[in-house]
Amino acid sequence: GGWTGVMGKRACTPAMMFSVALAMLQRDGRWLLQLRDDIDSIIYPGHWGLFGGHLEPGESPAESVVRELKEEISWSPPATLQPWFSDASGGRNVHVFRGELTVPLDQLYLKEGQDLRLASLEELRSEWIWSDHCREKRPIAPGLNIVIRRLLAEMHDV
């Protein structure tokens, strides 16, 4: 690897990157999103994103995504979520899983974030999605663009 910066510090190696595991859950042709809290200390406050989070030490992405779903919406997938793709272009190692949300939205108990919603493909493409909780449209997190592009590419392949 090359040397960068005035202090001659080595560029970050992938091993040093944050790893996150996220869930792209589908129900009735819509996808489950989380509206992040309006807290300045978190990444992309007040943006729509996917449920999931950072891997704990020694945890696999698959274990992490199941734990996070239980912590964030009190739901455990009845079947194993399928690894969909991984992406490290945004400075963190993102593992995206996909699966079916097997319960209606009103059976989820939101414990992290300020709102949740099943968004249509049209809404995802518009990049601004209505929040009932906030009574206004909120932007999608930049990281979600990779997921949406992947989704659109697959739909064109079909």
Predicted features, each with a name:
Residues 136-158:
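Charged phosphate-binding loop/patch that engages nucleotide di/tri-phosphates or the phosphate backbone
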Residues 30-71:
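Conserved Nudix-box catalytic region and its N-terminal flanking loop in Nudix hydrolases
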Residues 54-137:
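Unchanged
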Residues 8-33, 51:
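Conserved N-terminal beta-strand and adjoining loop/helix that marks the start
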Residues 15, 23-24, 40-41, 86-87, ...:
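Short secondary-structure boundary/capping segments
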Residues 18, 26, 45-50, 91-94, ...:
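Short connector loops at helix/strand junctions that flank enzyme active sites
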